[in-house]
Amino acid sequence: MSAFIVLGAQWGDEGKGKMTDYLAENADVVVRFQGGNNAGHTVVVGEKEYKLHLIPSGILYNDKLNVIGNGVVLDPKALFEEINYLESLGVEITPDRLIISDRAHVIMPYHRVLDGIKERARGNKDIGTTGKGIGPSYTDKMERSGIRVCDLIHKEVFEENLKETLEVKNKIITEVFGEEALDYDEIYNEYLGYAEKLRPFVKDISVIVNKKIKDGKEVLFEGAQGTLLDIDYGTYPYVTSSSTIAGGVCIGAGVGPTAITNAVGIAKAYTTRVGKGPFPTELLDSTGDWVREKGHEFGVTTGRARRCGWLDLVILKTSARVSGLTSFAVTKIDTLAGLDTLKVCTGYRLNGEIIDYVPASLEDLAKCKPIYEEFQGWDDSIANARCYKDLPENAIKYLKKIEDFTETKVSIVSVGPKRDQTMIISEI
C-alpha cells in the first residue's frame, strides 16, 4: 500500500494516536488532514508518554516527514507550545521533519473568544465545544473571510485582512454580546511573531504529498475525532466542524480519491463519547464507572470524563459504509478483561421497527433502543497476548462478531498502550 488512511470509527478517543504511531513505522510521510488542537492523541514509547494535539504522530520517528494539511485549522500559539513541549522531551522539530500547508486557515484570538461566548449563550443547549476556536475558524473559512497561513506570512496582506475582519468581529463581540473589544495592535504584533516562526515550515503540501505518492512512498493520513463527529454523518449538531471520514482526506490534503489504497477504522472494544448527544449503548451504572476507571477514560485535551457504553456495531457498520473501510483496528480489548458477560449492540429498535443504521434525526436516535447479543468475557491475561493465537477464545469470538456484522475484517488488535502490545492479525 502506498497511501492509506487511519481514522476514528466511533466518537473519537479510539486510540488513533497509538495506531498511527504503530503504523507510521513503515510509512515515509504522515499527514494530518482535518481538525485542530481540539484533538488529543496519547502515544506511549518505551517508558515515555507523549500527548499530541496538532502535530502528526509520525513526529516520534526520526525519519518521517510530517504534514499539517490545508483541512486543519491552525492555532499558531498552540502549535509552538506543542513544539516546545516535544523538544523538552527530546523530539527534534525542524522544517525537514514538519511542513504546514500554506492553505490552512489560522485560528485567531477572536475565534476563541466567540467560541466561548456563543457556547455560554446556548445555556443548557450547549454543544460541548472545547472553546479553542475551531468552529468559528471553520465558519470564517466557509464565509470566505478567514486568514490563511499564506496570508499570515505576507505582512501587508495580513495587516489588511486583520483590520477588515477584526472590525466586524469586534462589533459582534461588543454590540451583540456586550463583551470587551479585542485590541488590533496586540493581535497584529503577536501574530507577526508567529508568522516569522512559521515561515520555514510553510509549503504547498498538495504538491509534495502527491509527488511522494507518485514516487511510491508510503503515505499515512491521520484523522482526528471520529466518524460520529463528522459534520455531515455525525450526530449533528453534537459534532466537530470538519469532515472526519475518509472523504475528508481529498479536500484536507489535496489528493485525489484514486490515490487512496486502504482505510483503517480505529474502534475501541467498547464505546465512549465526550459531551452531550444521544448515546444508545451508554452505561449509566457501576459497569460504566468501572470501564471508565479501568480504561482511563478522561480526555487528553479537556480532561473531561468520557461517557462509556457497550460496543455498538451499528456505529461501526455506518463507519465502514461512509468511509469505505478496508479493515478495523480494535483497541483496548484488554480494558474489558474481568467482566463475566459482555453485550454488543446489533441493531436499534425505533418506533416498532428494527434498523441497522444511525438515523440522521437526533430525536430519532434518542428514541433508539439497543438490541443486544451477549458474549462471555475473558481475564487479564489478554494483555500478554502478542499474536492472534494468544488471544482468549472468547475474545476471538468477540472480534469475529465485529467482522461478520460490519462485513469488514479486523486487521489489528491492541491489548495495551505500548507499541509491543499491538498485533497485526491480517493484511491491512
From Swiss-Prot:
The cofactor note from the UniProt entry for this protein is:
Binds 1 Mg(2+) ion per subunit.
Biological-process GO terms, alphabetical: 'de novo' AMP biosynthetic process; IMP metabolic process
Q: Which residues bind IMP?
A: D13, E14, G15, K16, N38, A39, G40, H41, T130, R144, Q225, T240, R304
Give the source's domain of life in one word.
Answer: Bacteria
Q: Which residues bind Mg(2+)?
A: D13, G40
What reaction gets catalysed by this protein?
IMP + L-aspartate + GTP = N(6)-(1,2-dicarboxyethyl)-AMP + GDP + phosphate + 2 H(+)
Tell me a GO cellular component. Answer: cytoplasm
- Enzyme Commission number, as recorded: 6.3.4.4
- List locations, semicolon-separated: Cytoplasm
Identify the pathway: Purine metabolism; AMP biosynthesis via de novo pathway; AMP from IMP: step 1/2
List cofactor names only.
Mg(2+)
From the UniProt record, which GO molecular function terms apply?
adenylosuccinate synthase activity; GTP binding; magnesium ion binding
Which catalytic residues are annotated? Answer: D13 (proton acceptor), H41 (proton donor)
Q: Which UniProt keywords apply?
A: Cytoplasm, GTP-binding, Ligase, Magnesium, Metal-binding, Nucleotide-binding, Purine biosynthesis
**Residues given in the record as GTP binding sites:** 12-18, 40-42, 306, 332-334, 414-416
**Similarity remark:** Belongs to the adenylosuccinate synthetase family.
Q: Describe the task this protein carries out.
A: Plays an important role in the de novo pathway of purine nucleotide biosynthesis. Catalyzes the first committed step in the biosynthesis of AMP from IMP.
Assembly behavior: Homodimer.
The protein in question is named Adenylosuccinate synthetase
Q: What is the lineage of its organism?
A: Bacteria, Bacillati, Bacillota, Clostridia, Eubacteriales
